[in-house]
Amino acid sequence: MALKNYKPVTPGQRQLVIVDRSGLHKGKPVKGLTVGLTSKGGRNNYGRITARFQGGGHKRTYRLIDFKRRKFDVSGVIERLEYDPNRTGFIALVRYDDGELSYILAPQRLAAGDRVISSAQSVDVKPGNAMPLAAMPVGTIVHNVELKPGKGGQIARSAGSYAQLVGRDQGMAILRLNSGEQRLVSGTCMATVGAVSNPDHANVSLGKAGRKRWLGKRPHNRGVTMNPVDHPHGGGEGRTSGGRHPVSPWGKPTKGRKTRSNKATDKFIMRSRHQRKS
């Protein structure tokens, strides 16, 4: 879908660029595929802030998305594409031939009336079809990729994202991710063909602070604007540079500091995303 550029008729419309969602469903979601969602405001069960700069925003209903795609060999037709406030990509409502309804992530170039199928064997390589990585031809663009068989897709789920199958090695599939990382994933893991819809999300300009508040995002204050009691960069007469390498409010180095500590899965990373891209 295209972008909508606004003329500065009002201050809030100056530099406003949003995604044109006129082609999406305008009604409510399927009630049986939704659950309630409680706004946490970045607080944990003690009421303490654990995620800063969150809170407010429009009330949301959570849509139950089928990330596993394990309804094998039952074809379905795309009823409609819908907006989902809980993610950046769009979602698609699938009506399977046995009558069941389900939401899936909508890939690019998927439209109402198209048919999709999921299978444990090889099926047509077209957007929306799901199959194990071992059944896909090398070079396929995929999204919603599982890291563990049966757990559901975890990789390449946000707007416009995808991974590419670049090879195979002893029952494992080699994926190139958006970050440049190349990693091994079991060939029995499911993935869906295509890239996630709404690639123009990266070009959105909200135009005013209030539109960010509607999304549940609160103002993000820099450390150098704070007092010394609040942040290691705080204080000083006039504007200062912080006087030290960038750190978090708790004194931990930030901006480039590596934080990965899962040594058990290091063996699956063939090329780090930190290596210079060739």
UniProtKB/Swiss-Prot annotation:
One biological process term in Gene Ontology: cytoplasmic translation
Protein name: Large ribosomal subunit protein uL2
Alphabetic keyword roster: Ribonucleoprotein, Ribosomal protein, RNA-binding, rRNA-binding
GO MF assignments: rRNA binding; structural constituent of ribosome; transferase activity
PROSITE patterns: RIBOSOMAL_L2
Encoding gene (name): rplB
Function comment: One of the primary rRNA binding proteins. Required for association of the 30S and 50S subunits to form the 70S ribosome, for tRNA binding and peptide bond formation. It has been suggested to have peptidyltransferase activity; this is somewhat controversial. Makes several contacts with the 16S rRNA in the 70S ribosome.
SMART domains assigned to the protein according to its UniProt record, in alphabetical order: Ribosomal_L2 (SM01383), Ribosomal_L2_C (SM01382)
Segment forming the signal sequence: none
PANTHER family: LARGE RIBOSOMAL SUBUNIT PROTEIN UL2M (PTHR13691:SF5), RIBOSOMAL PROTEIN L2 (PTHR13691)
Segments passing through the bilayer: none
Family: Belongs to the universal ribosomal protein uL2 family.
Subunit composition and interactions: Part of the 50S ribosomal subunit. Forms a bridge to the 30S subunit in the 70S ribosome.
Origin organism lineage: Bacteria, Pseudomonadati, Pseudomonadota, Alphaproteobacteria, Hyphomicrobiales
Entry-linked Pfam families: Ribosomal_L2 (PF00181), Ribosomal_L2_C (PF03947)
GO CC annotations on file: large ribosomal subunit
Annotated region (Disordered), positions in chain: 214-278
